[in-house]
Structures are given as C-alpha cells and as structure tokens.
C-alpha cells in the first residue's frame, strides 16, 4: 500500500517536472530520469519489504493458535480423559458386581443353613423324652420296657444306682465317675448267674457286643413308654 502510493507520487512529480519545462536541457532530462529511476527503485524495495513482512506475519498467524482454538483443544482433551476415566470406573464396577453377588449368596445360604439347624435342634429339645430318662422332669422311668426289668430284680437297687449315676453324670467321658457303682452292680450280677447270666457273659467276654455300659446307654436312648402315673 505504501509502496504503491510512493510510486504514484514519484511518477506524478516526474511528469510535472517534465511538463513545466518546455525544451528541457539535457542535464534536466537526465536529472528527471534519475529521479524516476530512484523513485521506482524505492517503490520496488518498499514493496519487497512489505511483501516479506506480510509473508512472515501470515506464517506466524498460521503457526500461532488462537485462544479459542486452545480452549477447544483443552476441552477436547479433558473430555477424552473424562470418558476414559468413566469407562475404567464402569469396567471396575462390572468386575466387582459378580464378586459382591457371590459373597452375598454365600452369606444368605449360610444364614439359611444355620436357621434350619437351630429350628431342628429346638424342635428336638421341645419333644418329650423318648428314653427312660425324661430331661424335662429330671425323672427316670424305671418301668420302661427298655430297661428289661433290671430295675426290679435282685440287683435292682445296684442297677438303679449305677444307671442314675450314668444318666446324671457330667464328666467327660460321660459315666467315668460311676466306675465303682458299675463294679458293685456287676458283682451282684455274678451272685445271681441264673438271672443275670447273659450280663455276666458279656462282662467276661468284652469282645462280644453289648457291654453293660453300652446297654445302659442304649436303654437311655431307646423309645420309652409314657411316664408312669405317680
């Protein structure tokens, strides 16, 4: 822009200088030519400088990023990072869901099993005793057929003492504190072999099934008849 104005002005001045002089001298003509050449040279130089400046400015403008473009780029970067984070969170949540579900199922199953066991034990405890001993009343039904009439024979008292000791025993193993009473009962059995011969044989042959202690335990657990009336 500046170069064009300067060039036009130079040409106008040169023309006016030539037109105002009729019949110019050779020296004047030479001076006018020099002025035109100088003006043209200056105009070309100014144009070249201006073009170079524009080129540099355009390149700088292309390389430089506007604030708006920078903000858009930052927003895009943030959006990508946010999406990636959300995807990772979703993946982590999906991977933990099966584990949480499995753990919850195991806990519920264990709770159901424990409740069922407690109900069964409670039902068993609430039922009347099925053996010679009734834990609800703490009494022993000596007339129970499961005792085989041993409570009424010649060694009935010895049997009752041994059996009662065994039933109420809290020692471990159960009945270990009733050994002496069992010996007394067995001695009584030996005095009456005609009645307690089978029990004596069992006592003298431990390899055979049915020791006295086992029979007492079996009698306690066998099905009992209704309790005798007082």
UniProtKB/Swiss-Prot annotation:
One of its GO terms (cellular component) is mitochondrial intermembrane space. Its cofactor is Cu(2+); Zn(2+). Residues 52-230 are mitochondrial intermembrane. A motif (Cx9C motif 2) lies at residues 178-188. The keyword Oxidoreductase applies. Residues 1-18 form a transit peptide. Keywords: Disulfide bond, Membrane, Mitochondrion, Mitochondrion inner membrane, Oxidoreductase, Protein transport, Redox-active center, Signal-anchor, Transit peptide, Translocation, Transmembrane, Transmembrane helix, Transport. Residues 76-90, 212-223 have a biased composition (Basic and acidic residues). Residues 196-206 have a biased composition (Acidic residues). A motif (Cx9C motif 1) lies at residues 155-165. Residues 152-196 form the CHCH domain. Residues 19-34 are mitochondrial matrix. It is a single-pass type II membrane protein. The chain crosses the membrane at residues 35-51. It is found in: Mitochondrion inner membrane. Residues 1-30, 58-111, 195-230 are annotated as: Disordered. One of its GO terms (biological process) is protein import into mitochondrial intermembrane space. Disulfide bonds join 144-146, 155-188, 165-178. Its main location: mitochondrion. Residues 1-22, 59-68, 93-105 have a biased composition (Polar residues). The CHCH domain contains a conserved twin Cys-X(9)-Cys motif which is required for import and stability of MIA40 in mitochondria. Monomer. Required for the import and folding of small cysteine-containing proteins (small Tim) in the mitochondrial intermembrane space (IMS). Forms a redox cycle with ERV1 that involves a disulfide relay system. Precursor proteins to be imported into the IMS are translocated in their reduced form into the mitochondria. The oxidized form of MIA40 forms a transient intermolecular disulfide bridge with the reduced precursor protein, resulting in oxidation of the precursor protein that now contains an intramolecular disulfide bond and is able to undergo folding in the IMS. This is Mitochondrial intermembrane space import and assembly protein 40. It comes from Cryptococcus neoformans var. neoformans serotype D (strain JEC21 / ATCC MYA-565).
């Amino acid at each position: 822009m500046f170069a064009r104005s300067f060039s036009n002005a130079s040409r106008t001045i040169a023309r006016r200088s030539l037109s105002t002089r009729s019949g110019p001298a050779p020296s004047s003509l030479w001076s006018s030519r020099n002025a035109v050449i100088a003006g043209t040279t200056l105009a070309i130089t100014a144009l070249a400088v201006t073009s170079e400046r524009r080129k540099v400015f355009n390149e700088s403008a292309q390389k430089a990023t506007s604030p708006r473009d920078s903000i858009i780029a930052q927003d895009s970067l943030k959006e990508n990072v946010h999406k990636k984070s959300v995807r990772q969170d979703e993946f982590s949540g999906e991977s933990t869901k099966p584990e949480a579900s499995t753990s919850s199922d195991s806990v519920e199953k264990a709770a159901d099993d424990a409740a069922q066991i407690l109900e069964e034990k409670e039902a068993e405890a609430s039922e009347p005793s099925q053996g010679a001993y009734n834990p609800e009343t703490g009494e022993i039904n000596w007339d129970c057929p499961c005792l085989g009439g041993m409570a009424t024979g010649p060694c009935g008292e010895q049997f009752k003492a041994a059996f009662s000791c065994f039933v109420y025993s809290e020692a471990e193993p159960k009945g270990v504190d009733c050994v002496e009473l069992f010996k007394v009962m067995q001695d009584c059995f030996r005095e009456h072999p005609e009645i307690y011969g089978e029990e004596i044989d069992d006592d003298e042959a431990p390899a055979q099934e049915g020791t006295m202690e086992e029979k007492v335990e079996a009698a306690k657990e066998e099905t009992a008849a209704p309790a005798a009336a007082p």
